Amino acid sequence: MLQPKRTKFRKMQKGRNRGLALRGNQVSFGEFGLKSTERGRLTARQIEAARRAMTRHIKRGGRIWIRVFPDKPITQKPLEVRQGKGKGSVEYWVAQIQPGKMLYEVEGVSEQLAREAFALAAAKLPLSTTFVTRTVM
């Protein structure tokens, strides 16, 4: 699963996830993309599950790009532990997603196959998404 190799600090504050995706909001690598229309966060497991669903449907066909990376650690205290005594240990990693963020891209497959693959991937994700096509200026 995806997670950073090294970080400057092990734990991070919760923070807020506001605004729209100003970067990574267009199809840059492939022909078709899966774009988020909702704000939230994706865990490394969810990103991997969606990738697997797409890869299995496309088979040997095209190429897939993952445009998000889980770089925020989420901590949890163990069950039945009283409050205090410091911050919990890192349990998993998430990518914070703003509306308009491109999640996945695909190239080398038909539009119909790309739509089917993205529908399978979207079913694994906790966000609402939309299918987009590359626009050449």
Swiss-Prot record:
Pfam families attached to this UniProt entry: Ribosomal_L16
GO MF terms held by the record: rRNA binding; structural constituent of ribosome; tRNA binding
Protein's GO biological process: translation
One GO cellular component, as annotated: cytosolic large ribosomal subunit
Alphabetic keyword roster: Ribonucleoprotein, Ribosomal protein, RNA-binding, rRNA-binding, tRNA-binding
Quaternary assembly: Part of the 50S ribosomal subunit.
Assigned protein family: Belongs to the universal ribosomal protein uL16 family.
Role this protein plays: Binds 23S rRNA and is also seen to make contacts with the A and possibly P site tRNAs.
Protein name stated in the entry: Large ribosomal subunit protein uL16
UniProt gene name: rplP
